[in-house]
UniProtKB/Swiss-Prot annotation:
Cofactor: Mg(2+)
Quaternary context: Homodimer which binds Holliday junction (HJ) DNA. The HJ becomes 2-fold symmetrical on binding to RuvC with unstacked arms; it has a different conformation from HJ DNA in complex with RuvA. In the full resolvosome a probable DNA-RuvA(4)-RuvB(12)-RuvC(2) complex forms which resolves the HJ.
Predominant place of localization: cytoplasm
Native species: Nitrobacter winogradskyi (strain ATCC 25391 / DSM 10237 / CIP 104748 / NCIMB 11846 / Nb-255)
Name of the protein in question: Crossover junction endodeoxyribonuclease RuvC
UniProt keyword terms in alphabetical order: Cytoplasm, DNA damage, DNA recombination, DNA repair, DNA-binding, Endonuclease, Hydrolase, Magnesium, Metal-binding, Nuclease
Name of the gene: ruvC
Swiss-Prot/TrEMBL GO biological process terms: DNA recombination; DNA repair
Cell compartment(s), UniProt: Cytoplasm
Origin organism lineage: Bacteria, Pseudomonadati, Pseudomonadota, Alphaproteobacteria, Hyphomicrobiales
Amino acid sequence: MISSPIRILGIDPGLRRTGWGVLEIDGNRLMFVGCGSVETREHMALASRLLAIHAGLGAVLDQFRPSEAAIEQTFVNKDGVATLKLGQARGVAMLAPALFGIAVAEYAPNQVKKTVVGAGHADKAQIQAMLKILLPKADPKSADAADALAIAITHAHHRKSAALAARMKAVG
């Protein structure tokens, strides 16, 4: 049985910059498709910033037509207001693929780092170095786009167990 390539959208949510990365998996091969970021300005009203994130990701979904999506889980920091705003951006970022009928898998930051680099406490430079090895055609212009590609790679490696867990959760 020949399977067709699967296209995955990785999302690194943020209110200032939401990174996105698209790759395809064909068997064990990872292929870079595209990456970038949706940027908002601090002077914009919160609702306008959230709308810009939604519209930007909607355009990415229209252009690249992924069949699966993954997003990084939010960590809680000492600044409650910043955490809340990040959560709002993350919610909008999850809504965009959901409106296209695409389930969104979630991965902890340490799991992304461990999958891509082999260490759960890797820094951004280590992640970017491994991206050059895993996806040599990728040239992310921002750390957010690089992180989004790392999230997509993580999903490519864990997608079968994530799908099984989602089915088990739905069954109850």
